[in-house]
């Protein structure tokens, strides 16, 4: 005859066995950056996607017309990014505190619509949240990251620079040849594509003096337009406002002396009507455009 005490013991034994037999919860995949974070129309670029729990290989996709990707992301053989002490532990217990680099390619059609696209990676344990990738129309370059003090890198305008602020206290310096009286635009696209970078831009003139600076314009993204006071080499310095930096601190910096829109007046129009639209910015028509 079963006693209440026997029943309780049997129930506890079953519960304990089920707890031991239950599998550990799966770790859902995630992504924290793509580098470079964009590409020019009509080009194919190799990209690095930083992610957690994507393992050796995983499928991924970029949504929208005019853009295709490699079928899979594959774990990079060399994981060059790490800050802090390593704590040895069995692989089964080691978490992924730092994103691991996954390699892939992106191809953009020459007539692809400009603007944002969203990409996702997934595996049997889930799907990562969508993140942004930018299709641009200007020539692009990708920063060649090196250790040590920043080395000024010369660029030819117009250009969109794909860079990254890493490690902490990193300062990137880009230089170009300016002409007295010419107008130049420098725009950072980082926070708007999901980067934690809170950028600060500083323009240094040929005489070593500061010409212009900016921190927040489009949210945490910097923007400035200035007129060159003299002929010569100008330096564009970019860094995090608090001198932070890590793998996800990617940015796109556009420097141009060509047409660049800042805003319109009025800000909107009514459907079914014609409106004289004033374009405000650099090297834009002075007369209104009818839309």
Predicted regions and their residues:
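Ligand-binding face of N-terminal immunoglobulin V-set domains in extracellular IgSF glycoproteins
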Residues: 41-51, 64, 81-130
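Acidic, Ser/Thr/Pro-rich low-complexity intrinsically disordered segments
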Residues: 27-86, 124, 135-137, 164-291
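Sec/Tat signal peptide C-region and signal peptidase I cleavage site
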Residues: 22-26
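Predominantly extracellular/luminal regions of secreted and cell-surface proteins
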Residues: 131-157
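Histidine-acidic residue clusters that define the catalytic metal-binding segment
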Residues: 161
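Bacterial N-terminal signal peptides
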Residues: 9-21
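N-terminal secretory signal peptides that target proteins for export/translocation
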Residues: 1-7
């Amino acid at each position: 005859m079963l006693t209440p005490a026997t029943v309780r013991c049997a129930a506890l034994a079953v519960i304990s066995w089920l707890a031991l037999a239950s599998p550990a919860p799966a770790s859902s995949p995630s992504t924290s950056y793509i580098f470079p974070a964009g590409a020019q129309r009509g080009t194919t670029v190799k990209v690095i996607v930083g992610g957690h729990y994507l393992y050796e290989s995983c499928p991924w996709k970029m949504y929208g017309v005019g853009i295709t990707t490699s079928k899979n992301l594959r774990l990079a053989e060399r994981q060059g990014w790490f800050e802090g002490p390593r704590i040895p532990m069995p692989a089964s217990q080691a978490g992924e505190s730092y994103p691991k680099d996954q390699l892939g390619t992106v191809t953009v059609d020459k007539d692809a619509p400009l603007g944002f696209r969203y990409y996702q990676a997934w595996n049997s344990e889930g799907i990562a949240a969508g993140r942004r990738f930018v299709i641009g129309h200007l020539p692009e370059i990708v920063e060649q990251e090196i250790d040590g003090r920043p080395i000024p890198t010369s660029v030819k305008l117009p250009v969109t620079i794909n860079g990254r602020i890493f490690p902490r206290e990193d300062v990137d310096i880009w230089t170009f040849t300016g002409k007295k009286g010419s107008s130049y635009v420098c725009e950072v696209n980082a926070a708007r594509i999901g980067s934690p970078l809170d950028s600060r831009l500083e323009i240094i003139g040929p005489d070593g003096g500061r010409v212009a600076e900016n921190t927040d314009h489009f949210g945490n993204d910097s923007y400035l337009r200035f007129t060159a006071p003299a002929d010569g080499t100008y330096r564009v310095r970019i860094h995090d406002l608090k001198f932070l930096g890590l793998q996800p601190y990617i940015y796109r910096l556009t420097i141009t002396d060509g047409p660049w829109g800042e805003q319109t007046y009025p800000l909107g129009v009514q459907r079914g009507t014609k409106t004289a639209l004033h374009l405000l910015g650099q090297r834009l028509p002075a007369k209104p455009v009818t839309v």
